[in-house]
C-alpha cells in the first residue's frame, strides 16, 4: 500500500475519502498523468499488474506495462478504464476518467485529480464554462467558428454520424471520436451540428480534449456554449 500511495502523491492525486477499501477508486481528467502513474507503479513494484478496458501498451523489455489481459499470476490487480467493462472481484485498485464515458455509473472515488497537463488555460476556461470541473496551467488556443465559413484543418474529429457523412461528402478526411479515443494531437478541429454539448456529453468532451496546442470548433453560427 505504501508504494501505491507514494506514487499517487507524486502525481498530485488528491485523497477525498478518509477510509480506503478495495477496490481503491482513482478518477482523473484527461491528461492528468493517470497512465503514467500506473506505469511507474508497475516498474517500482513487481507485485502489481494492470489490465485496461481501453488501449493496452506496447510490450516492453521489463514486462511492466498495461496489458489487455491478466497474466494468470497471483498479483495485486489494477484495472484501467474500469467503466468500460467488468471489474474482477479481486481488483486492488481501479482507474478511470468518468467524464469521458457514460457506460456505467462510476464508483465513489477515493482519489481524484482535476488538473490536466495536456492542454492549456483557454481549454480550461471553455470546459468550465460548459460545466466540466477541469483545470489546466499551460498555454493553448481555442477558436469557435462557423461550420460553413471556415475550413477544418489538421486532425479533424466528430461524433455525430450525420457530421461524418457531411465531411465525407466534401472529401474531408476525419475520424469519429471512437476511432481515436485515448489519442492526442497538437492541433484538432472538432466539427459538430450542436451549439451546446447536449446529444452526447461524453463524446463531446472527448472531442474537446484531444489537443495539446490548439482547438478549432466548427459549429452553426460560431456559437458553442452551455445550454
Swiss-Prot record:
Residues 1-131 form the (+)RNA virus helicase ATP-binding domain. Residues 132-227 form the (+)RNA virus helicase C-terminal domain. Keywords: Host cytoplasm, Host-virus interaction, Inhibition of host innate immune response by virus, RNA-binding, Suppressor of RNA silencing, Transport, Viral immunoevasion, Viral movement protein. It is found in: Host cytoplasm. It comes from the Viruses. One of its GO terms (cellular component) is host cell cytoplasm. GO terms for biological process: symbiont-mediated suppression of host innate immune response; transport of virus in host, cell to cell. InterPro entries: (+)RNA_virus_helicase_core_dom. Its main location: host cell. GO terms for molecular function: ATP binding; RNA binding. Homodimer and homooligomer. Interacts with capsid protein. Interacts with host AGO1; this interaction targets the host protein for degradation, thereby suppressing the antiviral RNA silencing. TGBp1, TGBp2 and TGBp3 seem to act together for cell-to-cell propagation. TGBp1 is the main movement protein that physically cross the plasmodesma with the viral genome. TGBp2 and TGBp3 would facilitate TGBp1 function. Belongs to the Tymovirales TGBp1 protein family. This is Movement and silencing protein TGBp1.
Amino acid at each position: 500500500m505504501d508504494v501505491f500511495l507514494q506514487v499517487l502523491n507524486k502525481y498530485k492525486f488528491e485523497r477525498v475519502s478518509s477510509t480506503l477499501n478495495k477496490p481503491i477508486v482513482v478518477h482523473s481528467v484527461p491528461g492528468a498523468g493517470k497512465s503514467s502513474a500506473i506505469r511507474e507503479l508497475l516498474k517500482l513494484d513487481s507485485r502489481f499488474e494492470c489490465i485496461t478496458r481501453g488501449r493496452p501498451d506496447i510490450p516492453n523489455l521489463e514486462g511492466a506495462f498495461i496489458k489487455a489481459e491478466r497474466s494468470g499470476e497471483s498479483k495485486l490487480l489494477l484495472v484501467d478504464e474500469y467503466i468500460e467493462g467488468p471489474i474482477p472481484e479481486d481488483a486492488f485498485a481501479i482507474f478511470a476518467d468518468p467524464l469521458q464515458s457514460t457506460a456505467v455509473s462510476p464508483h465513489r472515488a477515493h482519489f481524484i485529480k482535476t488538473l490536466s497537463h495536456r492542454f492549456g488555460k483557454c481549454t480550461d476556461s471553455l470546459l468550465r464554462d460548459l460545466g466540466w470541473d477541469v483545470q489546466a496551467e499551460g498555454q493553448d488556443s481555442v477558436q469557435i467558428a462557423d461550420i460553413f465559413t471556415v475550413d477544418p484543418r489538421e486532425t479533424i474529429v466528430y461524433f455525430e454520424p450525420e457530421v461524418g457523412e457531411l465531411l465525407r461528402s466534401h472529401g474531408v478526411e476525419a475520424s469519429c471520436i471512437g476511432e481515436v479515443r485515448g489519442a492526442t494531437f497538437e492541433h484538432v478541429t472538432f466539427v459538430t451540428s450542436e451549439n451546446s454539448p447536449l446529444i452526447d456529453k461524453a463524446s463531446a468532451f472527448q472531442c474537446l480534449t484531444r489537443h495539446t496546442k490548439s482547438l478549432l470548433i466548427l459549429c452553426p453560427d460560431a456559437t458553442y456554449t452551455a445550454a
